[in-house]
Each structure stands twice: as structure tokens, then as C-alpha cells.
UniProtKB/Swiss-Prot annotation:
Cu cation 3 binds at residues 132, 423, 488. This is Iron transport multicopper oxidase FET3. It comes from Kluyveromyces lactis (strain ATCC 8585 / CBS 2359 / DSM 70799 / NBRC 1267 / NRRL Y-1140 / WM37). GO terms for biological process: cellular response to iron ion starvation; reductive iron assimilation. Binds 4 Cu cations per monomer. Residues 50-148, 195-297, 387-506 form the Plastocyanin-like domain. Pfam families: Cu-oxidase (PF00394), Cu-oxidase_2 (PF07731), Cu-oxidase_3 (PF07732).
Length: 631
């Protein structure tokens, strides 16, 4: 039999290449147990933090694209559930490993263990991981993740440094939650942090070599405040944002919201005679109040001479000179996605419900978690999975068709900035309007499809982006990753308030894909926490359109007056009228004073003075008590 080398050699090369790829791919296995320990993060105050195997901080990870990650996460807490999310990874084909509780998994009960097992097939760059339960990452349950490309990076550097930024609270999240989601905080004012930290400390020292190019991977792992970041007398060249390599863009300052990542190149000077300040600054426009003892800046040290003096803090002429990421261009120049097949328009509002607590809303709905994780509803609902109703009336669920171009128009009617994150995708930011100010008669300004800025030919792409106050953003992405994907504000306080929605992408394909099926471990985790892994948002498996018993948001404050309000107003008015009558009646009555009272008022001895007729004094209100001569 004659073998055609024309077909055989390419096949052999493909086989060898595939074998080499498999051979080079590694499996990274981690066994982590959560717990509590005391730690003084900023050098000023010791407080409980969440530990990993009794240690703090949590480990920073570095893997290569194509590698497999296996994390056995054991819940070592006594009194709370937990979960884990790898922020920015697409989890293509492994949606159940994404991590947000009640979205793609049941929460992990105390004493239970869940295996996160996935291959990083289509991501490289700078990422991070964190708990997706109750703001636990604000208590320290988080770390960075660097995914190296299979080939070389599209830029040169000598050394790599990971820089983790965050704000820090002295109270733990449980305490802050009780004060925040409370009738005594009706405006929804977010808790004010006590400090800015960098790499889980304050006033970090970074020893550098002269004439060296450093790659800084900068991650804001905080839960609230955006930060300005700059290094005294050093430019930064941006080369990557959120796992997307971009054309080089040089700046002196970055503006980094929570959950965003920037990779920058910094080339050090030849002169080692001076050390330089590394600066962080709160975006104080996000703070409702600024306490007198809050330091808005934090200074760390870039040391050319480790024995030299540490630098003083560095000032800038304007805080507005930061890089605008809207104008970054992806290195692979992905063209603007064509006109969308489906546009989702959502309006952001912050308001109070009937219980007096302040909530956040998309289109007048505040996200309320279902009784069954949404992914499990999508997998068990059959053809009903195409009906958004099965996912609940308070989850803001949208069902997407495979490979459609999706557009999200987000109108921010709030007076603050919001960083929004989309799980499972990177998106194009095709429009972001400037912020508007009610104080000068502006805003809010919703997006106008007939009157907007020209869309860029090659829009910036990332997975976390901010919207300005009382303004709008427009995002586009391709629905090419079947799964249930969370879209939410990454300010943890706003997520607690319900600023989130769900995108259920090609559920029928998920049902027919082997890698998307629940593992036995997933099912056991649900059973151990007392939850079902089948059913609609109400837990109903007989009729997926029957939502009786589902979780719903607190009732709205009713229009007009309730019966109690009418009664209260009636008696208040009656009390007011009676009060006016009393004032009028007693105010018009003459109040006679005795002679002795008048004399004592004048500071005289009653026994030493001649008795006089005081009727004239009592009858003349304007008379001075010293106007009569008493002899």
C-alpha cells in the first residue's frame, strides 16, 4: 500500500505539535483551607483576616496558557459559606467552575470541600482570584494570577513585578454590612476605609536596578475605591489591560478601578543617587464623607540606593492627567462588532425600599438570588431554559442566542462612578460619555442612539470598565461562550445592594455539552448546604414556569399614603391645631403679678419699700421694670 507523504507529513506535524503542547502543559494542584487569623496589614491596627492554610496573605499564582488548575477548597469556617472565582478567566466549556454562589454553584458549607478543575485554554495576561461570597475578599480572601502565553510576550522586559492595590478597613465585613444595609443608613453611604495598601502592606519598599526594564502587573483587588497610581519622575508604558494586549501607550498616571488590571513597562534611570516615591491616591469623589484622620495618599518607595534616604511623597499638578483607557487599541485590532443582534438597555438607580434600606436597581429591579443556582436551572429546565421567566423575576435574566452580537447600553442615573464587570467575556467599550453634574444643572444624560460620539474602529477591550456619574457606557461582545454569566458592579457594597444581572447564553447548547454537565462534587456541595441542584428559581421541578415561593425583593415604598400614614397624619394635624388653640388662648390671657413678685424682680427687699399699685406695670407690656420710681 502506497502512503501519500503529501497528506502524511502535515498530519504527523500536527500530531507532533499536539503531543508537544500536551507534554508542555502542566497541572497545578492546590489544597486550600479557609480560616481566621489576626494580622496587622497596614502596621497600625491588628484585625482578623481570612487565612489560607493558616497563612496570610493568600498565594500569588503563576501558570502558563494551556495549563490545568485544580484547587481543592475546603471551608474551614465554623459559621459561614464560601466560594472562589477566578476573575477574568473565560471558563469556556467549564461554566460551573466560574465561582459566584447561587449563579454557577451552591455555596460551600462549613467543613465541605469543592474542586475547581479547569484548563486555561484561551486566556493569558494578568488576573486575580477571590471569594465570591459576601465580600470575603475584603477580609483578605484573594490573590493574583499571572497566566503566561504559550509563546513570548509581544514586548521585551528584564524583570517582572506584581503590584496589588487595595483599600483597607479596620472592621471586618460582617460589622460593616450591619451598618451599611441598615435603615439608619437610608442614603446608602458606603463605609469609609481607613487606609490604602499595596502588596498587603503600607509604605512598601521596592529595590530596583539601574537601566533595567520592569514589567509591572498592577491589580486593584479592593472592594470599593478607585485609585490613582503614579511613580515620581517615571513614565509608564501600558502594554496590557485585563488580559488584552494593547498598542503601547505612555502615561505618567493610571486610574484603576477595583477589579481592573494594567501591565506597564518602566525603564529605570542610570543614576542611582536618588530614590523616588510610588504614589497611591483615593478617588475621593467616591467617598460620601472624608474623615479628618483619613490619609488620601499613600507613599511607597522605589529605591535605587537601598541605603539612601526614603523619598517624601510626590505631588502632581493635576489629578486629571491620567490615561483614559477608552483610547487604548488592542494589539490584534479587533474591528468594531457589527450592528448588534440584541440590545439590552439598563438604567442604574439607587433608592430605598419599604424596609427603609437603600438598594441598587437595574430597571427598577434589585438582584435577588434564586433558590437554585441559575446554571443548574439552565441545565435542568429543558426547552423552558429559553424562557427567562424560569430564572426568576428578580434576577434580571436575559437569554442570549449563540454567536449573536450583544450590546449593553447602561445609563447611570446615579451621581457616583461604577465599575462593571462581565464574567465569561471581554467586551468592546464602544462609547463612554463624560460625567454630568446636577449641581450645575446637568445630568443625568442617557445614551442617545441618534446623537452620540463616533464609535472607534478598533474599540478598547477588557472585562471591567467604569461608567461616569449620570452618564452612560455602551458595550458589545459576541455570545460565543455558552454559560450563565454574571454582570455586576464590582463595588462590593453595590453588589450587596443588588446591582447585577444575568446573561444566560445558549442554554440549549450547554445542556448538550459534556464538559458543561455538573460534577458529582457540585451536586454533593448543594446537598451538603441543603439546596437543590435542579429546578427553577423557586426550586420547582414539576412546572418550571411556576415561580410560587421564589425569592423576591423587598416591597416598594407605596405611592401616596398607607392607612397607617393617613391615621398618623390625621392625629399629627389634630395635635397641631390643638397646640395652636392652646397658644392663642393662654397667650391672650393677662397674667397678673403680685406686688411682692414685682419688687423681687427689681432686686429690692419687699419689707424696705412702700407698697405701690402695680396694676399699671402689669397692664403695660412695653414698660421697663426700671421706669417707675419707687420711693
Amino acid at each position: 500500500m502506497k502512503v501519500s507523504t503529501h497528506h502524511f507529513l502535515p498530519s504527523l506535524l500536527v500530531a507532533l505539535w499536539s503531543w508537544a503542547t500536551v507534554a508542555q502543559a502542566a497541572t497545578h494542584t492546590f489544597n486550600w483551607t479557609t480560616g481566621w487569623g489576626n494580622y496587622n496589614v497596614d502596621g497600625n491596627f491588628e484585625r482578623p483576616v481570612i487565612t489560607c492554610n493558616g497563612e496570610f496573605p493568600w498565594p500569588d499564582l503563576k501558570v502558563k496558557r494551556g495549563d490545568r488548575i485544580q484547587v481543592y477548597l475546603t471551608n474551614g469556617f465554623d459559621d459561614r459559606n464560601t466560594s472562589l472565582h477566578f476573575h477574568g478567566l473565560s471558563q469556556n466549556g467549564t461554566n460551573m467552575m466560574d465561582g459566584p454562589e447561587m449563579i454557577t454553584q451552591c455555596p460551600i458549607a462549613p467543613g465541605d470541600t469543592m474542586l475547581y478543575n479547569f484548563t486555561i485554554d484561551d486566556n493569558d495576561g494578568t488576573y486575580w482570584y477571590h471569594s465570591h461570597t459576601g465580600g470575603q475578599y475584603q477580609d483578605g480572601m484573594k490573590g493574583t494570577l499571572v497566566v503566561e502565553p504559550e509563546d513570548s510576550l509581544p514586548f521585551d522586559y528584564d524583570e517582572e513585578v506584581v503590584v496589588q492595590l487595595a483599600e483597607w478597613y479596620y472592621d471586618n465585613v460582617d460589622t460593616l454590612d450591619r451598618k451599611f444595609m441598615n435603615v439608619y443608613n437610608p442614603t446608602g453611604a458606603e463605609p469609609i476605609p481607613q487606609n490604602l495598601i499595596i502588596n498587603n502592606t503600607r509604605n512598601m519598599t521596592w529595590n530596583v536596578e539601574p537601566d533595567t526594564t520592569y514589567l509591572l502587573r498592577i491589580v486593584n483587588t479592593g472592594g470599593f475605591v478607585s485609585q490613582y497610581f503614579w511613580i515620581e519622575d517615571h513614565d509608564m508604558t501600558v502594554v496590557e489591560v485585563d488580559g488584552v494586549y494593547v498598542e503601547k501607550n505612555t502615561t505618567s498616571m493610571l486610574y484603576i478601578t477595583v477589579a481592573q488590571r494594567y501591565s506597564v513597562l518602566i525603564h529605570t534611570k542610570n543614576d542611582t543617587s536618588k530614590n523616588y516615591a510610588i504614589m497611591q491616591k483615593f478617588d475621593d469623589t467616591m467617598l460620601d464623607v472624608i474623615p479628618n484622620d483619613l490619609m488620601l495618599n499613600a507613599t511607597s518607595y522605589m529605591m535605587y540606593d537601598k541605603d539612601g534616604e526614603k523619598p517624601e511623597q510626590s505631588y502632581v499638578d493635576s489629578i486629571d492627567d491620567f490615561l483614559d483607557d477608552f483610547y487604548l487599541t488592542p494589539l490584534d485590532k479587533v474591528e468594531l462588532y457589527e450592528d448588534p443582534d440584541y440590545t439590552i438597555t439598563v438604567d442604574v438607580v439607587m433608592d430605598n425600599l419599604k424596609n427603609g434600606v437603600n438598594y441598587a436597581f437595574f430597571n427598577n429591579l434589585t438582584f435577588t438570588a434564586p433558590k437554585v443556582p441559575t446554571l443548574m436551572t439552565a441545565l435542568s429546565a429543558g426547552k423552558d431554559a429559553l424562557n427567562p421567566l424560569v430564572y426568576g423575576t428578580n434576577t434580571n435574566a436575559f437569554v442570549l442566542k449563540k454567536d449573536e452580537i450583544i450590546e449593553i447600553v447602561l445609563n447611570n442615573n446615579d451621581t457616583g462612578k461604577h465599575p462593571f464587570h462581565l464574567h465569561g467575556h471581554i467586551f468592546q467599550l464602544v462609547d463612554r460619555e463624560r460625567g454630568y453634574d446636577d449641581a450645575i444643572g446637568e445630568g443625568p444624560h442617557p445614551f442617545d442612539p441618534e446623537d452620540h460620539n463616533p464609535f472607534p474602529d478598533y474599540p478598547m477591550m477588557r472585562d471591567t470598565v467604569y461608567v461616569n456619574p449620570q452618564s452612560s457606557i455602551v458595550l458589545r461582545f459576541k455570545a460565543d461562550n455558552p454559560g450563565v454569566w454574571f454582570f455586576h458592579c464590582h463595588i462590593e457594597w453595590h453588589l450587596k445592594q443588588g446591582l447585577a444581572l444575568l446573561l444566560i447564553e445558549a442554554p440549549e447548547e450547554m445542556q448538550n455539552t459534556e464538559s458543561q454537565q455538573l460534577t458529582d462534587n457540585h451536586k454533593q456541595v448543594c446537598e451538603n448546604v441543603g439546596l437543590s441542584w435542579e429546578g427553577n428559581a423557586a426550586g420547582n421541578t414539576n412546572d418550571f414556569l411556576d415561580l410560587v415561593g421564589q425569592n423576591v425583593q423587598v416591597a416598594n415604598i407605596p405611592d401616596g399614603f398607607t392607612a397607617k400614614g393617613i391615621v398618623a397624619m390625621t392625629f399629627s394635624c389634630l395635635a397641631g391645631v390643638l397646640g395652636l388653640i392652646s397658644l392663642s388662648t393662654y397667650g391672650l390671657m393677662g397674667v397678673k403679678k403680685s406686688e411682692e413678685e414685682i419688687i423681687r424682680d427689681l432686686g429690692m427687699d419687699p419689707d424696705a419699700v412702700e407698697k405701690v399699685d402695680v396694676s399699671d406695670i402689669n397692664s403695660d407690656e412695653d414698660s421697663s421694670r426700671t421706669s417707675k420710681n419707687i420711693e
